[in-house]
Amino acid sequence: MYSQEDHIFQLCSTDLCASYVPVINQSVLVTHIVNYEDYLQIQASPLQTSQPTPPEELHTVGYVFTNDGQQTRSDEVNQVATGHQSKQKRSRESKRHSSSKRRKSMSRWLNKQEDAAVTHIVCEEKINNDQPAPDNVLSTAPPWLRDMAAAGISSTSTRDLYATVTHNVCDERMENDQLQLNNVLLTFPPERVNMAVADFSAMSPRDLYATINHNVYEVRMENNQPQFNNVLSTVKPGHINMAAAGIPAMSAKDAVVNLNVHGEKINKGQPAPDNFLSSVTPGLINVSGDGATVTHNAYEEKMENGQQAADNILSAVPPGLINTSEAGIPAMSTNDLYATITHDVSEKKIKNSQPATDNFLCTVTPGLINLAEAGILATSTRDLYDTATHNVHEEKMKNKHLITPCQQFHWDLLICQELLNFFIWIPDATVIHNIQEEEMENGQMPPDGFLSNSAPLELINMTEDCMPLNALDSFSYDFTSLSREELLYKHDSNEFAVGTKNYSVSAGDPPVTAMSSVETPQISPAMAKKINQDIKCQLMKEVQRFGQNYKRIFILLEELQGSMKVKRQFVEFTIREAVRFKKVALIQQLEKVLKEIDSHCHLRKVKHMRKKIIVI
């Protein structure tokens, strides 16, 4: 016989309007549940506990069938005792049945994290059709993946539930010239939060125990009406996209560096209020060490629609991959963080037939800097302990207005320069480049451009300039008359000879004749080895090509540096590559070259033996 205690199931709503208790008579149990759908919803609700305490009054409705076929309806209020109930004997089936019911009700709560003390308290207010919408309160949300689109939070995930990190966000907007009520989002856990309103996308805290705050203040102008303040405070460090501050893709790697940004703009001829972004953590910036003292100070002024825009100041920017296009310094990277390097950039431009003022770029770091306006491409400092300074001053001619180019560079020690596919190796020599350039722009002759002082210890590609070169240590010739046909290579001595030829700058310019003394700068073994390695790679590619045009292969073999023994090794290597790809015609031609090298070596040996005999 079933006991009443084992089969009491309660249906609880917010006002306890109805509940259910089975009625037992003559060992026949037939029950009717009031509002069964509500019962199922409450069973799946996380607010319902596994074993609720029964109330004092339960409104029961039941139908009882007796053996004689009669049906009676009981609709009464039963007093249920809350104290100790009498113990009754239970059968094995009843015990199994009751235990399985309890396991099912408790199974969905067994995996719940009880130690996590993270709470989501979300309060949101909106205005719909000029009427205040009632409060939408989402409280005590558990710390797992939930979609809270109403609060502007998508794909939230708690990484560390024991970290005490709080996001306090206050947002105000103007819609249809009506003030929208405050939308307050507070006490968000540290996780990936998508705050499109705050211009923060894909935030991820790297270190949850770091105390870093983002204090953001923003004001905008919309339809000539001042927008109310949008205050975003105490935001955790992470991937933050602050396009207004010109700092994209930020990631906190050093918790001690702050970005102080002040910006002003003019929209439709009206000055916009101050857009102030302060105490922002460093972003996707290449900072591998903490001991670096590097500062970027940028100053910029522009003219828009005939009105002078307010000063846009970007100060105290940490070192790294920063795109300062207004200052003409993209893709900057500091390789040595123990060097004290400062970027002071000042730029002013005026358009629409107004003379531009001096554009001055001073004390630029020795890094991978692309100064296209200064005529320098791909400069790289190899020795980071060397103190290097770049002083650049430039003016240009546009629309028949005179702009003077004036550029200066101060560098030290050794030069290895590539000019018109020509490599120069100068060991232990100090070389000075004095460069003078004149160009015709719109019928006006700009003043002389001058590049002075010593050259750096790196490869510099300055193909746009015609550079007269003055070198020390018996290495002096004029590059103004240099062209590709003037480089005469001597295979026997591994030297280049520079001759005298006519050189014309362009089709319309008169030919320029320059005299230069013939010098033979030797190529070092390291440089020769590098050239041969490049030739080897090119030979492999040429052999793999389709077709029977092998002219390029023999040109590369003639450009090899070194003795005949080295050339023989490269010819044998090329033959092996041709055998791999079954190039029969190429193999036959290379075998002829190999025979010529062998005969040449044999003749040199014979001459050497004759000299020895004569000496004896």
From Swiss-Prot:
TM spans (from-to): none
Give me the stretches of Basic residues compositional bias: 86-106
**PANTHER family referenced in this protein's UniProt entry, alphabetically:** DEAD/H BOX POLYPEPTIDE 26/DICE1-RELATED (PTHR12957), SAGE1-LIKE PROTEIN-RELATED (PTHR12957:SF36)
An individual GO BP term = snRNA 3'-end processing
User: What GO cellular component entries does it have?
Assistant: integrator complex
Q: What is this protein called?
A: Putative SAGE1-like protein
Q: Polar residues composition bias: which ranges?
A: 69-85
Question: What gene does the UniProt entry assign to this protein?
Answer: SAGE2P
**InterPro entries attached here?**
INT_SG_DDX_CT_C, Integrator_subunit6
Q: Where is this region: Disordered?
A: 69-110
> What is the protein's species of origin?
Homo sapiens
